[in-house]
Amino acid sequence: MTDVSVKAQADPIAKPRSDVFLLILIGALYFSQGIPMGMAMEAFPVIMRQNGVPLELLAFVPLAGLPWILKIFWAPMVDNCWSAKLGRRRSWLLTMQTLLLIAMVLLAFVPATSANAVLMIVIMSVGMLASATQDTATDGLAAERLRAGALSRANALQIGGMMAGFMVGGGGALLLIDTLGQQYLLLLLSLIPLATIILVLLWKEEPQANHIATQGKARLLDCFRRQGIWPLLLLAFLYGSAHAGGMSITKLFLVDLGWSNQDAGWVATLGGLVLIVLGSPAGSWLASRKLWTGLTIGVFVVMVGLGTWGLLALGSLPVNWITVAIATLWLNIGSGIIAVCAATLNMSFGGSGKQAGTDVTLLQSVNVTGEMLFAGIVVWLASLLGYSTMFLAVACGGLLILVVARLVRSRLSPAALMPLNEDATGA
């Protein structure tokens, strides 16, 4: 197994004074990336259905999300190709934000009817392609230029920003669609990628970053040759189960108990807000000090949350707004901590190599695949074992994440953790 020296990465690291603007830029980019996801996965299926689009056509809407899984196959191109005039990351950020802006403006002028359903799905797919490709460039930017505490803060912005963007593009759009109408709503949301384009234009990428290309072209196969990549891939596959598995089944559990769709929606909104406001900042704070300890704390907090849901399903606790809020609080605080700590680890690994965008994208693609699989597995387990046994079994399964995390720590080279300071990698 080979690992890449981090010496060539020393020059592109952002100076502390420039970290603030860079973090603002990165947060805005992650926020804008979440908006098309919320629109495609949550808002537009509802809007199109209300306008009479048949379910047979709506079944194809989730295909718009495929770029987020498949982006690993063109991630090396994002690392390898850019305009010398614009800069390595700036080239892709400007191009993809412009493409996203065009897609959103086009959607504003295409009525959500059955006749336009296929066209809308195609336009949404273009928007998702832009956001997924931009994500590779944004991750590469953060991994190459940020270190220590700034890196953990960037990952808090990643998790919280994308969740916030998803909520604005999803639930936020549904709240405003009746008041503003489709055209004005989409034009209003289009101001967000327009604002990020302005931020990218204001940021001048240091030309020193361009010398990374002299280390050789980025290749997907090179990811698999790095020391410690296989246990890290396993961790990436598993850690998303905490949030995706928990949140996908809790709403079904409440609906089966007679809660309304609106009530379940409020619980989901509460969970998202908790992850943004409490979970992600807590994860950033822990990751910047004791990353491995933070990951362990996050897993145990999630286990408490899932255990609380299990007690609700058993009838040991009454199911009311207070107990549901407490269970949601634990689950999403823990999920936020895990996500930020794991993402910080992934970016540290990517930033220590020669192809940060490709390496981080591979880990993210595996993570998304794991989330999708676990979201279905927990539903299957609930049908087989019942809600209470399923919740408690998944809670105990959190220990597997800790076992794999210890394996990752033992297999990674010291160079892979150099972007983090010594304290952050402590026990």
Language-model features: locations:
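A late C-terminal transmembrane helix in Major Facilitator Superfamily
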Residues: 353-383
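Juxtamembrane intracellular "pre-TM" segments in multi-pass secondary transporters
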Residues: 7-19, 205-233, 427
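C-terminal transmembrane helical hairpin of 12-TM major facilitator-type secondary transporters
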Residues: 293-342
